[in-house]
Design a protein with these regions (language model features):
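Active-site donor-binding loop signature of nucleotide-sugar glycosyltransferases
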Residues: 11, 150, 190
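Short, acidic Gly/Pro/Ser/Thr-rich loop/turn segments
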Residues: 47-48, 155, 170-171
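C-terminal accessory segment of soluble enzyme catalytic cores
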Residues: 130, 169-222
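Acidic/histidine-enriched ion/cofactor-binding microenvironments in catalytic or ligand-binding pockets
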Residues: 150, 155-156
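Conserved phosphate/anionic-ligand binding catalytic regions in large, soluble enzymes, centered on
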Residues: 156-166
Length: 222
């Protein structure tokens, strides 16, 4: 097993509090004073703006608090019913390749979705993980179920991924998610496959080694 910590927060964590904790931990990792960390949590309802966010994509600026953040990407929604995964890995000890890291995140999400019989796919022109809506007999309709937004600071990763378990999907209407128009957002619940956070978290953790373990492309250097 890799030398890495896992933390699951049972209570919702305020956004700025989480960012502060993450930045402090990343600083300690950079100095070799702390182990890598994968942190699973939920936030209260909010919109976060990545470094490429366009103000026109914020359709309802007064609906929820809006936070500017250093991660890549555009606007996204976070809130109850969504599993947030903040990933703090030291790529100096792994593979210093940002594209390979993002690819590993995508594959990790897709692998986890498959454990619940949901077929997630990536798209070269659209960030995130997508599903074809065969559940409503609309195979040509694609909705996003997982989002990715990262930052790399001195080769230590920040931010990470979010997967829609059972959020209020109407809350996404206040933004154009990730600046991508013409596509919807879905969740496990929306697709008729409600699950418990515990079950999702266990499958996510079980799949970590496959994509970030010692024998993976993003594994620790020997």
């Amino acid at each position: 097993m890799d030398d890495i910590d896992w933390l699951i927060s049972s209570e919702r964590v305020e956004y700025l509090e989480a960012i502060g904790i993450m930045n402090e931990r990343v600083g300690s990792i950079q100095k070799g004073e702390a182990r890598e960390l994968v942190w699973l949590l939920e936030h209260p309802p909010l919109y976060s703006a990545g470094t490429s966010a366009k103000l026109d994509d914020l359709l309802m600026p007064n609906r929820f608090p809006v936070f500017n953040t250093g991660r890549g990407g555009q606007y996204t929604y976070h809130g109850p019913g969504q599993r947030i995964v903040y990933i703090m890995l030291d790529l100096r000890r792994r593979r210093q390749d940002i594209r390979a890291y993002v690819s590993a995140l995508e594959n990790w999400i897709i692998n986890t979705l498959a454990k619940f019989n949901i077929h997630g796919e990536r798209r070269s022109d659209r960030i995130g993980i997508w599903v074809r809506r065969t559940d409503i007999q609309q195979p040509n309709k694609e909705d996003k179920i997982g989002a990715i937004g990262i930052r790399i600071k001195r080769w230590v990763t920040l931010h990470g991924i979010s997967i829609n378990i059972a959020p209020n999907l109407e809350h996404f209407n206040g933004i154009i998610p990730c600046g991508i128009e013409g596509y919807g957002v879905t969740s496990f619940e929306d697709m008729g496959q409600p699950i418990e956070f515990y079950d999702f978290d266990m499958e996510l953790r079980n799949g970590f080694q496959k994509f970030f373990g010692a024998r993976s492309e993003m594994g620790l250097k020997g």
